[in-house]
Amino acid sequence: MQIFVKTLTGKTITLEVEPSDTIENVKAKIQDKEGIPPDQQRLIFAGKQLEDGRTLSDYNIQKESTLHLVLRLRGGAKKRKKKNYSTPKKIKHKKKKVKLAVLRFYKVDENGKIHRLRRECTSEQCGAGVFMAVMEDRHYCGKCHRTMVFKDDDK
């Protein structure tokens, strides 16, 4: 049977084939006529690209059908180089989990009474849960910078 192959230039070539011929055979015949290597050829019929291992009858290609020949495009996006960093990556700080850490803030005396070792900041800006640092003669809040000086009887 006779089929037509339309190239990109608009030129139509005729090929004598059998329905049992594979797509590879058709590409070889196109190479004989046009000189285009089979690995660069893409044949399209009814909007589908024809795969090499299949036959013409698999795609229901009948006599006087027209195949479209396009050239294969190689490659894709440009390959990017791997970046070389001059300084090593900074290691993220991992918070250490200490069991019963809350016990550092309280002291239990021999009578069983609980005393707070640190003082909470009284500022409205800080709120509850912000403890003040204990200095030699004062308490200091690192968040709002409030300082409370000890009296002799406070210690």
UniProtKB/Swiss-Prot annotation:
Residues 1-76 form the Ubiquitin-like domain. Keywords: Cytoplasm, Isopeptide bond, Metal-binding, Nucleus, Ribonucleoprotein, Ribosomal protein, Ubl conjugation, Zinc, Zinc-finger. Pfam families: Ribosomal_S27, ubiquitin. There is a cross-link at residue 48 (Glycyl lysine isopeptide (Lys-Gly) (interchain with G-Cter in ubiquitin)). The record marks 54, 72 as: Interacts with activating enzyme. It comes from the Eukaryota. InterPro entries: Ribosomal_eS31 (IPR002906), Ribosomal_eS31_euk-type_sf (IPR038582), Ribosomal_zn-bd (IPR011332), Ubiquitin-like_dom (IPR000626), Ubiquitin-like_domsf (IPR029071), Ubiquitin_CS (IPR019954), Ubiquitin_dom (IPR019956), Ubiquitin_ubiquitin-like (IPR050158). GO terms for molecular function: structural constituent of ribosome; zinc ion binding. GO terms for biological process: translation. PROSITE patterns: UBIQUITIN_1, UBIQUITIN_2. A zinc finger (C4-type) spans 121-144. The record marks 68 as: Essential for function. One of its GO terms (cellular component) is cytoplasm. There is a cross-link at residue 76 (Glycyl lysine isopeptide (Gly-Lys) (interchain with K-? in acceptor proteins)). PANTHER family: UBIQUITIN. Ubiquitin is synthesized as a polyubiquitin precursor with exact head to tail repeats, the number of repeats differs between species. In some species there is a final amino-acid after the last repeat. Some ubiquitin genes contain a single copy of ubiquitin fused to a ribosomal protein (either eL40 or eS31). In the N-terminal section; belongs to the ubiquitin family. This is Ubiquitin-ribosomal protein eS31 fusion protein. It comes from Plutella xylostella (Diamondback moth).
